[in-house]
Regions:
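A contiguous, low-structure linker/loop signature
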Residues: 84-104, 110
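Alpha/beta catalytic cores of nucleotide-metabolism and tRNA/nucleoside-modifying enzymes
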Residues: 4, 8, 12, 18, ...
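Hydrophobic faces of well-ordered beta-strands that scaffold small-molecule active sites
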Residues: 12-16, 37-39, 67-71, 94, ...
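Non-cysteine beta-strand/loop elements that form the S-adenosyl-L-methionine
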Residues: 39, 93-101, 160-170, 223-226
Length: 341
């Protein structure tokens, strides 16, 4: 699959997730077989550009190309300027966020709230595409309200504006993350457009990825929440698509090694204070369903230093290994549920 002149190594893409898809997470997912990754959304508000959070999000140093920076906002001029800034900062692809359902984003008429104003959508698309000489992509949803899905018009207008690829989440803003993703509309959009279409929503297993690709005809799938604490899902899906067989689930030693490596990267990237706090959610995701994990997490949340946090995690996994832990009943049940979806 191509996005503009860039050929991706495969059709598995890491979804942009605020507070999750930082550079360490994107790098890890690419290591495990993701063909592409999109950054966390970055505000187009110039007054916030030099904030600590914005600088972390715009850090692409040493990242595997192509580098994709997602921008969010509601003012065409500001978004165009933000696109130029991110390209100057190293972005090779600019992604426009019209899909975030978060209340604090939609209250500013950004994210998926933009779908309420198709004229504004068109002006933003035209402004950003005209502002930069790199491919511009769009991440969006089926519409703002159920029963008023306008994705067919928005998608066609995006293609006319020169958007290089469309990533489509199969829900409306009203749905948030409830109900099930509606792949039938993604299929209709794919049949209408000539640009690549990336299917997103509820893709949480190798079987589901294959089903969505086959059913929708999409050029790629975008995986978000299912990769939290499970970055090897890209390797699993890639193997299944190529062979029709499953890779063995990682054992406890492998999970330990991946998590400790991830923590080291987070500490190096964010430093002592933020590194410790940002790592907590990742530790929780990696350990979900493991033996005595609830008690472990409650104790882990109280740790205030990276060194102690690292040691606490290492000790927990060493205890699991000593007890012969392979995979808990909870995890087995979760995997079985995923594979039947």
């Amino acid at each position: 699959m191509y996005i503009g002149p860039y050929q991706l190594s495969n059709n598995l893409i890491v979804a942009p997730m605020a507070g999750v898809t930082d550079r360490p997470f994107r790098t890890l997912c690419k290591y495990f077989g993701a063909g592409h990754a999109v950054s966390e959304m970055m505000t187009s508000d110039q007054t916030l550009r030099m904030s600590k959070k914005s600088l972390y999000r715009a850090n692409f140093d040493g990242e595997i190309a192509p580098i994709s920076a997602q921008i969010a906002g509601s003012d065409p001029f500001e978004l165009a300027e933000a696109a130029r800034y991110q390209v100057a900062n190293g972005a090779q692809i600019v992604d426009i966020n019209m899909g975030c359902p978060a209340k604090k984003v939609c209250n500013k008429l950004a994210g998926s709230a933009l779908l309420k104003d198709e004229d504004l959508v068109a002006r933003i698309l035209d402004a950003v595409v005209a502002a930069v000489d790199v491919p511009v992509t769009l991440k969006t949803r089926l519409g703002y309200l159920n029963g008023h899905e306008n994705i067919m018009r928005v998608a066609k207008r995006a293609e006319e504006a020169g958007i290089a690829a469309l990533a489509l989440h199969g829900r409306t803003r009203e749905d948030m993350y409830l109900n099930t993703a509606r792949y039938s509309l993604i299929k209709e959009v794919k049949q209408m457009l000539n640009i690549p279409v990336i299917a997103n929503g509820d893709i949480d297993s190798p079987e589901k990825a294959k089903y969505v690709l086959d059913y929708t005809g999409a050029d790629a799938v975008m995986i978000g929440r299912a990769a939290q604490g499970r970055p090897w899902i890209f390797r699993e899906i890639s193997h299944y698509l190529a062979t029709g067989t499953h890779l063995a689930a990682p054992n406890i030693q492998e999970v330990k090694d991946v998590l400790l490596g991830h923590l080291s990267e987070l500490y190096d990237f964010y430093g002592e204070y933020s590194g410790c706090r940002i790592s907590r959610k990742h530790i929780a995701w990696y350990t979900k369903g493991l033996r005595s994990s609830n008690e472990f997490r409650q104790n882990m949340y109280k740790v205030e230093s990276t060194a102690e946090q690292f040691n606490v995690v290492e000790d927990y996994f060493n205890q699991l290994l000593a007890q012969g832990e392979i995979m808990s009943d909870v995890q087995v049940e979760q995997v079985n549920l995923l594979e039947t979806k």
